[in-house]
Amino acid sequence: CVTAVGLAGCGAGIPNGPKKPNGSSAPAYTAPPVEDKVDMLKNEMRNMNIEGAVGKILTANETVWVQKVLQDNPRLFDAFLHPEENDLAKAMWHGEFPGKLLSGIAQTYLLNNDPRTKETGDRMVALFQEAQGEDGYLGPWSEAVRYNKDVLDPNTETWGKWDTWGQYHCIYGLYRWYQITGNQEALHIAVRALDGIYNYFIVGGQTFVSQNWAECNLAIGHAFALLYEATGKPEYLQAAEYIVNEEWNMEYPDFYSKTILSCGWMTAALEGKAFYESGQPRWEGLYALETLAVLYRVTGNETYGEAMESLWWGMVGTDRHNTGSFGTGEGATGDPYGHGSETCNIVAWMAFSTDYLKMSKNSYVADELELSFYNASLGSLLAGEREFTYMNHSDGSRESALIILEGHSFDGGRDMSCCQANGNRGISQVAEWALLTGTDGLYLNYYGASNMQTQTAGGNSVTLRQETQYPKNGAVKITVTAEQEESFVLRLRIPVWSEQTVVRVNGEVCEGVRAGTYYEISRSWKTGDVIELHFDMQMHFWMAEKGTIGQKVSVYYGPLLLAYQTSDSLRPTTRFEIDTLRAMEPIEGDGLVSFRCTSSKGEAVIFTDYYSAGRNGEAFVSWIVAGRDLETISFEKYGNPVWNNR
């Protein structure tokens, strides 16, 4: 019974709590490590050293957005520092902004270990420390209305707000910053915040759903599970399981449907229903669903793993769009052809997918992450590499979140919106899945110019340097540097779309390479070993199913979705032939890739990658009118993806 744990309050076991004001020394946590009972993959990346065309994009965003965000938004923390006396106009999700930012900054630091990025992250930790209440509270709301107090007030009519949701993002960002940089203060602040939430809700006998907006506020279960791993505090594990097994089924008034409902995610998953068929299919729920992966890892309870698997496959089969984005609008609808996905959808989808990749060790999942990264995620970043869009459309144009979501902003925080605060986490999330460590070796998922530094399960430092122009072409050269010679398995992701892949190790051709799998190379690895890969970069397609959006097709070159810009003479209705699309000619251009093609009427058309096609606000098309020369592929679990039609 979770409510019987820690009745004297949660926090008494934390030594030497921080002294106000900031400048205190946080204790190092020495709890024994929580055992991984199911042997999940881990991210042991130290520095990705990302280079090439993608590296230029991400580094530019790091320079003009990440490293200047506090300077450009000087009142970002004002409501946190002065919750009882501030005049800021606050959206109900105001508390998420600094946490989302720090989560992205942590990942961004993994890209290049830029000391200016570390300085920004450390400064945010200091501001969190200064703002934290004596009871651990880490949000922007006054005592009278925080948590569920406004909802419970009989003299107030309100739908409530996203208080534990905002604190969840702050706790997660602090936790990840601690993991990546070793900043003990970040972990200490996160623990104090979580203890405050535990004391108010669990010890105080309040339900999390009493705040309403349960699809958001139940994300705090993920924080409880993660910090159980970090600290070993059993009450955190009990709280996480209580939220999943009880609060996910509790009813609350839903703002969107104006009905009483429960999220019911576990029930839906175990009944084999897709996420859109659950009680609450909003995108925010994916952070709550991440609790399942951690609980599976620390308990070994197969029910959590089964639910995680069911939910992921249900989403990829019914709600993943041609861009690799998730859901239509702001949630799952069961329609992969729907118009547009919010940037925040994409960030949550990639976080959830990364968890499932670590659990499943299935290269299919890594293929989906690559699809999402190169298209939906990069596609959320506009020209200038500073601003992100609110909505990513398969066809149409992109507009800055600073315009569409201006109502989220406030004096001294004019850049702030849910998507602008979250966008950097989306594009930097590649550092979370690029190269993973298992108990018997490494899993290489990302191909692109880089010099990735990681370690094996035994603690041996290994660097994989990639020299390549991928995805512009399919040639990749990998040079190994190992601190010590070591025998382990290096698993190379062979994309499902690369039908004929050639792999060489130190010049010797490898046998048995198959598309859609990890190719395993078991040997004693030493400095100077060289791996060469040549991927099959033939065009492949997603033929829209009959009865959906008409005779349309999406064209892919490797992981890149292709699109063309419309004009007075080149319209969304312009028709192409499949054979012509298959034989497009590569040319030099402004995109990551560019191709020349002709329409059915003989018009010359330039195709580029989806990211490049709309970054300046131009109208574009990625669902292309074409003859039905290909049979459609229906979704099948573990089968050939719908976007890999030949």
Listing of model-derived features with the role each one plays in the protein:
Residues 1-2:
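N-terminal export leaders
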Residues 7-9:
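C-terminal motif of bacterial Sec signal peptides marking the signal peptidase cleavage site
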